[in-house]
Amino acid sequence: MTYFPPQSAPMTDSGVGKLDSADVTTAQSIVGASAVAAKKYYITSIILSVAAAGTYWIEDDDAVQVTGKFSLAARGGVSWAAPKDTPLASPTVNKGLKVKGTVAGVIGCTITYYLAA
């Protein structure tokens, strides 16, 4: 995971990404690259719930992990909120974010984010 304090990059846009999927063994988009416009995503919170036990994470369009891997039990979940000055940053500009997992099964994921240079 890479942490980038946003002091040098003023917030320009923010939003919420939501995904409900039956299978994330193939990464599924939660926010698309079209919304990025030469900026990085800074993730400020994550809520992830899963039906099947497995390992899950958020990655960019190039399959580079943005979060660590969450090893979750069946019907498990995780909730995470970043301190204001240390959000998780996507590694490169112009990349969307996807949810990926090691097993098929219903998942729900919500992230909050802002975009900045």
Task: Name these PLM-found stretches.
Residues 73-96, 100-103:
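Beta-sandwich interaction modules
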Residues 23-24, 67-84, 112-117:
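A signal for specific C-terminal beta-sheet/loop modules enriched in small/flexible residues
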Residues 1-42, 92-94, 100-117:
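C-terminal interaction-tip segments
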Residues 51-70, 111:
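Short, surface-exposed beta-strand/strand-loop-strand elements in extracellular ectodomains
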